[in-house]
Amino acid sequence: MPLKKLESSNNQAIIAEEVALLKEMLENITRRMIGDDAFTVIESIMVLSEKQDYIELEKVVANISNQEMEVISRYFSILPLLINISEDVDLAYEINYQNNTDTDYLGKLALTIKDLAGKDNGKDILEQVNVVPVLTAHPTQVQRKTILELTTHIHKLLRKYRDAKAGVISLEKWRQELYRYVEMIMQTDIIREKKLQVKNEIKNVMQYYDGSLIQAVTKLTTEYKNLAQKHGLELDNPKPITMGMWIGGDRDGNPFVTAETLCLSATVQSEVILNYYIDKLAALYRTFSLSSTLVQPNSEVERLASLSQDQSIYRGNEPYRRAFHYIQSCLKQTQIQLTNQPAARMSSSVGLNTSACPSPASLENPILAYDSPVDFKADLKAIEQSLLDNGNSALIEGDLREVMQAVDIFGFFLASIDMRQDSSVQEACVAELLKGANIVDDYSSLSETEKCDVLVQQLMEEPRTLSSAAVAKSDLLEKELAIYTTARELKDKLGEEVIKQHIISHTESVSDMFELAIMLKEVGLVDQQRARVQIVPLFETIEDLDNACDIMAAYLSHDIVKSWIATNRNYQEIMLGYSDSNKDGGYLASGWTLYKAQNELTAIGEEHGVKITFFHGRGGTVGRGGGPSYDAITSQPFGSIKDRIRLTEQGEIIENKYGNKDVAYYHLEMLISASINRMVTQMITDSNEIDSFREIMDSIVADSNMIYRKLVFDNPHFYDYFFEASPIKEVSSLNIGSRPAARKTITEITGLRAIPWVFSWSQNRIMFPGWYGVGSAFKRYIDRAQGNLERLQHMYQTWPFFHSLLSNVDMVLSKSNMNIAFQYAQLAESQDVRDVFYEILDEWQLTKNVILAIQDHDDLLEDNPSLKHSLKSRLPYFNVLNYIQIELIKRWRNNQLDENDEKLIHTTINGIATGLRNSG
């Protein structure tokens, strides 16, 4: 019997009960805001949407005034948000229940480690596995921070619903408090008035560390070690989960990311983790009242206690408290030294005896900052050893164990920050450096071989740098060198882990990587023997992915590269771009090209004695590589996950996965279990069959790519269709991120960034990037020979990659709505442009039919009943928003809305994204 999957809501009855209650409250609040007569409009359009009477719905919406639109669009935006909260609460409840009752579910870490423990290499795998979710600020999170905070309050209240029903707490008081928060969220601005700045993005993402991630990662790592120990495996400081960060370091296409934002990102992160430690030490101070008259501490604890400036007579016999006071004081000094910020959150209210006068002896021993997390951990270990010596092992568990585990994971830096820049920027900077140093006058005109020769020669000439104070530099070069200088300073101050990788967007050649090496050498981050920052190529387009193996084979052949990799435990990371490859070639071509590239790059690494690790640049939607995390990882090519995998978590996905600590724990658990299972599971499918499957896929994908590009790049009306029949213009003006919607002025599809591309197709409900070209390509293969449908059905049943590929298409099709898409098409100005819709419609119908045939299903989402039920309950609400959005766009484009009314469109964008749950 297959194990239960917890990735979506399961308890439909309790969810329906909660949603009915929330809806009743929202209705009462809305009636009071607009009156009973106006509320009848909401009721009537709700009925029309449920009946799918879209013609009449369109007429009713067209007669709603701009003023009425504000509350109506708000109502239908808040309602799916409340449904989301209820489903999230149910998932958190289910996770706790399954764990507390020791029930098995898919991806449960206890099962994964139990299965692994009996294998010869089980301990090695558990020691080495490292999964790194990298949080990014990609602009797909449309919710304001204030709305997210109110959402959290409602979530916490709904967690108490079962207790309220059972009478454990007052049901009436509970309802009153819930009503207050629903009223607040209904009457709070949904849309940001100003565009986010990078500093806002840094601050916003930090709330997830404070609220859930630090606790979840720490708890999960402790459980990981305990489970291994249960099976006789003593692990030495494993790190199954560490965190990554792009915000503040990702400057590709974002001119607002500078040396200052990089420094701010690292400093804020350090401040957050040090505050966490300081708070934990305060809690330990409060609870560790052990008296030396009853328990004799060891000499090291006595030494720490003697250094404390808390010399109150009330603490004379409490050496552990004084030791914790001293450690905390050292942490405060560390925070001042590393961040130039005192521990502002700390006060006497947290239990410290801040009023105690320091003794003369303590003034002779001023508090010193820790030189490193190792020194901090050593003091904690001394206390642990003293407790063990006295038989107090039970006292180690809890806060002391948690903070000791946290310092192993987070150090003083919290999360490693990636730097990223486009290859063209680096080339321009290196060309300027070479010209200024009178080495090459026109570097960009050189052949690839000539470029590499020049670059390697410069890298071998130590310690010579190319820049000189006597030579004027462009603003671009000054800015780039400042960022790299800041990176070096941060590594010197916070440790090597704070910045470990630099990613090169649009890597197209070996010289792209050596150009970055030159820039790093300029500030002392690279020399002949060592690269303190790993150079990570990002292969994004179909063409670049096809060329990746040749590029990496040539790069790995250089002696200087071998030296760099040798100092990095023989790892070379490669980032794979799901978004641009999809925009370039369509869903099938992207998925298959990425799959093949991983196989081939892994083989190249083995030839050179290098462990290739992959960084998956996924988004939330299927069109950007999204989908269920467990399935995505376990369907990776066999052998492609050695022991380390990184993946981006961005936008609305961060809130969905890490909004509370229970769900965060579960999603991190899924990532670890999926990675281990993919590492150790033998190839399920027969190897001879796999070869034939690959031949079939090569043929199908070639057709799919051609069909996709014929419409997107060859149809002269497609560009206008996208810009007129979707809210792309309105999305681009929405204040959801610091980064521009395009790297440059948009004159063609290739110039548009992948996120607004996918986001806009989600809004008009076509979901184009997640399926277009799939149906025709499969149909051609099926029609080619008798038995081909059966071959595809067999592939679906036996090949995890193919099964995941089609399941994602199934999910995307279920969220699309061609009736609504038709109405968006009417926004186009000419019939030729509107006719593009019919090409899309034909392919959509064909894709749906073919997918169902291969799956041998009668309807979409047969394998995912919980998602099917969830969509059924929420679709009527945000379908209404689409019709409201279409009407508002008509008015806006016909100058029937003023600038203040533009935010009405933004409200609908917000609501639709909320209802879909994965928007970009």
Swiss-Prot record:
- Any Pfam family the entry gives: PEPcase
- Keywords, comma-separated and alphabetical: Carbon dioxide fixation, Lyase, Magnesium
Q: Which NCBIfam families match?
A: PRK00009.1
| SUPFAM superfamilies xref list | Phosphoenolpyruvate/pyruvate domain
Answer whether the UniProt record assigns the keyword Zinc to this protein. Answer: no
GO MF terms, alphabetically ordered: magnesium ion binding; phosphoenolpyruvate carboxylase activity
| GO process annotations (BP) | carbon fixation; oxaloacetate metabolic process; tricarboxylic acid cycle
Which cofactors? Mg(2+)
This chain belongs to which protein, by name? Answer: Phosphoenolpyruvate carboxylase
Instruction: Give all cystine bridges in this chain.
Output: none
Per the UniProt entry, the Enzyme Commission number(s) are 4.1.1.31
Residue numbers annotated as active site: H138, K583
